[in-house]
Every structure is written in C-alpha cells, then in structure tokens.
UniProtKB/Swiss-Prot annotation:
GO BP annotation list: cellulose catabolic process
Protein residues bound to O2: 183, 192
Key words of the record: Carbohydrate metabolism, Cellulose degradation, Copper, Disulfide bond, Glycoprotein, Metal-binding, Monooxygenase, Oxidoreductase, Polysaccharide degradation, Secreted, Signal
Disulphide connectivity of cysteines: 75-197, 116-120
Induction (free text): Expression is significantly induced by pectin. Expression is also moderately induced by cellulose. The degenerate binding motif 5'-SYGGRG-3' that binds to creA involved in carbon catabolite repression is present in the promoter.
GO molecular function list: metal ion binding; monooxygenase activity
Glycosylation sites: 157
Protein encoded by which gene: LPMO9H
A Pfam family this chain is assigned to: AA9
Signal peptide: 1-21
Source organism (scientific name): Emericella nidulans (strain FGSC A4 / ATCC 38163 / CBS 112.46 / NRRL 194 / M139) (Aspergillus nidulans)
Name of this protein: AA9 family lytic polysaccharide monooxygenase H
Length: 434
C-alpha cells in the first residue's frame, strides 16, 4: 500500500470513533465511581472491580426486539454482575456519564431500579424485578424527527441524572439506565436498546419495597413506543415499559416528558466546541464508492473523570461498519474507537450524510479540512493546529497524494505520530463536577 493511501486510512481511522456509546462512570451523591469500560476490560486478564455490570457488547452495539425475551435485554449482551457498589442516600442523585452519543440516535431515556434482596454481586439477573423510577421521551414533536430525551442528554455533556426515590428502603439495588434509539424504529425490530446497569447501596430512606417486572417482560417488539416512525410529526409518544412508579421522585432526570411539549432546555447547545479533523471515508460493503464529504459536526462533548479517581488507561482499538436505512436515504459509516484515559477522551467526529451538492465535490475531502489540520503541533488546547513546528499540508487532493508519496518512512511516521498526538493527547476537554 502506498504511503499516501496509508496516511489516508490512518487519518480517517484516527478521526472517526464509535457511533454508539456506553456509561464510563457515575457520580453518586458527589462521589465518582468508575464504570465498565467495554472497549478495554473484556481484553484484560485482571480488570478492576467497578460498579458497572460487565458486558460483551465490544462492538458498542445494541439489543433489538428479537432479544427482548433473552437475558441480553436486562443489562446488555452477556452481562454479568458488577463486583462493587456505589453508595447513595435515598433521595440522592446519580449522574451517569456516557461517551459521546450520536445525535441521529433519537429516543427516550428510562431508568429502573431493582432490589437485589441480598448480595448484588451474585444475584441472578433474571430474577430482578424492575421498577421504573424515571422516564423522559419526546420533548417537542412539531418538526420531525423531533427533540428527544437523548438530545437533552447530549446537551448536558452526554450525561443523565436520576434521583433515587426518598421512600425507597435501604439496601442493595441495581440501577438499570437505558437509551432506546428510534431512528430505525419504523420497522419491527428496528428500535435499538442500550441498557446499562450499575450496583447501588442505598442508605437511609423509608420502607418502600415495590414489586416490579422482570427484564424479559419489559418490552415487546410491537409496543407503541418501540414500533414508531419518528420521521413524521408526532403529537405524543408513549414511553415503553411498565408505568412510572408512583413513589418516583420525578418523570425525567434531565427534563422532558412522555408527551410532546416545548422546552428551552431541549434546544440548548453544549458549551464545549467541536474540533475539525480530516475525515477520509473508505469504501465498504454496501456503501457507495463515492467518498462522503464531511459536514460541520455538532459540538462534541466528552465525559471526564474527577482528579484522583482515574481509571486505568484503555489500550484497545475497535473498528466496525454500520449501515442504517432512513426513509428515502441510506447512510453507511465506518467507525473506529480509540480509547484513552477517562480524563483524556479521544476526539470524536461524526460523518454526516452528504447532500447532492456535497457528493459532487466529494473528491476534495482533504482540501476542505486541510486548514484545520495544517499539521498537528504539541501545543495543547489549540484548535487551529498552528505553531512553530507545524508543516503546512497541500490544499488539493492530488498534491496531498504527491506530498505523502514524497515522504520517507521516518518522515511519514513522525507526521502520523504528530497527528495522533494532536487528536488524542493535546485536544482534551475537561469537565468539572458541580
């Protein structure tokens, strides 16, 4: 493979990260606890004991309607008990921190809790009875596909806060937190469930010990909130699952409700700006041979770990291809995840579907982003990538190819190292806990 082509693949892989997500950690009553890092821990011989349930969704995939009667719907694919618990007082809050959630994956955010009736590290997940304590669905359906709870989660720095009911009896519980993506839900088994579970030790509280619903009976593939076309204007939306427990503290952790309503919070914009990086899509099975031209992406927001509570540095890299069919259009994206320390998350960029005009000019992919990548530098925090050590790249694709071909192996490796350092190490967003 030529140096130019190798460079193209390397830059594309570094710029695109996994399209779905998972909970990296939680903050319970102000204390941070690490979650299960599915992009690293499955490949470790001795993963740490964390509050998040272990699972095997290493492709960052989902559970669809065909899995609603299997154990996978409970806490995700092949989930096993967490070996630690987070302490939270009844009436307290739990903030769940996600990796960047894709904007196209609109849908409700739902929280359940189930008593372990003993040791949560050994409880049989199929016996857990889930009680819904929080739900948020369609916020504004006046313009398809609408504004959803998932959009509020994104605007809140990819996090969601749920209140533990104050009347709940003290003891060991499993919190089941879930996003249901509805972008393909117009077809049966098209909805995508992303359940995440964490162990809690609830203190104080009252005497309430409500009975619930076992995980394999929460949903059916034809439930009104599961089989739904979000690409038509919706006046209302029925959040799937059992009814909200009357002892729950609220109807939604980050605002929004089961029916459509206007909400200023729904249109709030994250304060952390995105970083432009070159995106050079590669040909894949089922995808058009015409390269996709990247369009300006939404602000990227990434979770962080408070100082002094850092999880081990992940080292695993995974790549997968996803093809999704929307009404009248097909979108194929190639995604690669680069894991790093929770305090230094990889820069994430989403490749949007090109318009007809963009497709006509798709051969100038690198040109459109060259000004943002005019060579990565070692200066931290610079969004332009300029500096005394920068090397200006050519501004047209043919010249760029010639430029890469002219590099020696050592020069190319140095350029690649600088690019990856700029993408992964220097471009860091931090978030303070409040």
């Amino acid at each position: 493979m030529s140096v130019a082509r190798t460079a193209g693949f390397a830059l594309a892989s570094a710029a695109i990260v996994a399209g779905h997500g998972y909970v990296t950690g939680i903050v319970a009553d102000g204390t941070y606890y690490g979650g299960y890092l599915v992009n690293q821990y499955p490949y470790s011989n001795d993963p740490p004991a964390v509050v998040g349930w272990a699972e095997d969704a290493t492709d960052l995939g989902f559970v669809d309607g065909s899995g609603y009667t299997s154990g996978d719907i409970i806490c995700h694919k092949d989930a096993t008990n967490a070996q630690a618990s987070a302490t939270v007082a009844a009436g307290g809050t739990v903030e769940l921190q996600w990796t960047e959630w894709p904007e196209s994956h609109h849908g409700p955010v739902i929280d359940y809790i189930a008593s372990c009736n003993g040791d949560c590290t050994t409880v049989d997940k199929t016996t857990l009875e889930w009680v819904k304590i929080s739900e948020s669905g369609l916020v504004d359906g006046s313009s398809a596909p609408g504004t959803w709870a998932s959009d509020n989660l994104i605007s809140n720095n990819n996090s969601w806060t749920v209140t533990i009911p104050s009347s709940l009896a003290a003891g060991g519980y499993v919190l089941r937190h879930e996003i249901i993506a509805l972008h393909s839900a117009g077809n049966e088994n098209g909805a995508q469930n992303y359940p995440q579970c964490v162990n809690l030790e609830v203190t104080g509280g009252g005497s309430a010990s409500p009975s619930g619903t076992v995980g394999t009976e929460l949903y059916t593939p034809t439930d009104p909130g599961i089989l739904v076309n979000i690409y038509t204007s919706l006046d209302s939306y029925t959040i799937p699952g059992p009814a909200l427990w009357d002892g729950a503290s609220s109807s939604g952790g980050n605002s929004g409700s089961g029916s459509a309503s206007s909400s200023a919070a729904a249109t709030s914009t994250p304060t952390t700006p995105s970083v432009s990086v070159p995106v050079i899509p590669t040909a894949s099975s089922g995808a058009s041979s015409t390269p996709l031209v990247p369009t300006p992406s939404a602000p990227a927001v990434t979770p962080s770990v408070p100082a002094g509570n850092q999880a081990p540095q992940p080292t695993y890299t995974s790549t997968y291809i996803e093809t999704e069919t929307l009404p009248g259009q097909t979108v194929t994206s190639t995604t690669t995840e680069y894991a790093s320390e929770p305090t230094q998350p990889a820069v994430e960029t989403q490749v949007a579907q090109p318009s007809e005009t963009e497709a006509a000019t798709s051969t100038s992919t690198v040109t459109e982003t060259a000004s943002a990548t005019a060579a990565p530098t070692g200066s931290s925090g610079s969004s332009s990538g300029s500096g005394s050590s920068s090397t200006e790249l050519p501004t047209d694709s043919s010249s760029l190819s010639d430029y890469f071909s002219s590099l020696s192996a050592e020069e190319f490796l140095n350029l690649l190292k600088e690019t990856l350092k700029w993408l992964v190490t220097d471009k860091v967003h931090a978030r303070s806990l409040h």
